[in-house]
Amino acid sequence: MKSNFTCIKKMPVYLLSASFCLGMFSCQDDVRTDGYSTKDVPELHALSAEQKEVIDYTPKNIVIAHRGTEFWAPEESEAAMRWARNIGADYIECDLQKTKDGVILALHDESLLRTTDVEVIYPSRQNDYVSAFTYDELLKLDIGSWFNEANPEQARSSFVGLDILTLDDVLMIAEGYRIKRDANGKRIVNRDENGKYVSTQYEPDPYDNGNRPGVYIETKAPYLFAGMEKALCACLKKHGWYDEDASKMKKIAYKNGVPGNVDIANTKARIILQTFSLGGLINMNKEFKRKIPTLFLMYDITNSTPASYAEKINFAIDNGATAIGPNIDYIKGYPTSLYPWQGDMIRRTGMDIHAWTFNTQEQFLKYTGPWCDPKKEGGADKNYVDGAFTNHADLAINFYRETLEGYLAKGLNYFRSNAKCGLPDNLHKNTPVKTAQQVLD
């Protein structure tokens, strides 16, 4: 039996019902105010002209599919990423690890114990980190069966035998492809003259519905994987997803030449970087010569004060970040880093807020405006969320498409403005209505 626990930003949604603590109240009564005045704010550093430009072209009200999904399919699997693309997420999110032979993986944990059968395949190495294995060795592991065991209601036979993805895989899935597999379901790969893994073969996904999401990438602390940011930049260049000259980035092809409902992959904001690491943020700023959307993540800021919070924001600004990623109060025991005074402080800088992790309608209502508007005046200033990480992209899309749109129909507009990037404020107003199961089927 695999452990279902993942820390902080990575807590699976199926634990939320037991640990989630949320009151049905307005921000006037909300403990998130924490006693601080929104005017009690230390000096905040100024954004550069380039940071402001990036913020202007980064879309607002975006749905970020956390690891594809943790709820409907095994996290960061091909099934999860294809589901997130087809359900209509604006971004599919992945974490980066690196193998012994330098392959960049889409995988959260440094340990393989939680989400693979490493204890069966490599019993003497089960406690080794991912970086101790070659990619060929990792391809022998099953990342799907544990999910079926832990989540019988979401279990599917097609999840059995799923393998660990690479960053290459995630980018290709975002472009409308799937991994090419043999009759036994094993991926078909290219090898060099010594038999070493070089790359994977892909084919057009017959279930591709035309959506072209962006990719939201998290790197770990530099001491875990030296040179990761440089390798990431090179990988994105190889695929045409990044270039110092934005005009030279690849045009992502559409299915049958017709754009889908999501087309973030064909914008300058096609890639967003994120990290909790101070050193990681510094390295991102160094390696990516052209500034791109970059998020500095925050969590578990116990006893935060305006001064200490401003210090983190200023570090982020000084090192190229264009957005802050605070956690909402979605798990008992982990204090939020998005109290109203904290959200107001971020707003004063002009940075975007991409918060994590939303898994219920009530959480969206609490942070996007409706529950912070006791006088029913409307206003985007009451919305502390430009982007929402979620394990339920289907629920998030429905919230924007129907709930916030419903408030707008009543004259209460809580949408953040997309006027500067030339997109509609409600990116999901016309997203087809499909259930998560329908997309999986």
Regions found by a protein language model. Give the residues of each.
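Accessible peptide chain termini
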Residues: 1-2, 292
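Bacterial N-terminal signal peptides that target proteins for export
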Residues: 2-15
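C-terminal motif of bacterial Sec signal peptides marking the signal peptidase cleavage site
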Residues: 22-26
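Phosphate-group recognition and catalysis centered on beta-loop-alpha active-site segments
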Residues: 27-441
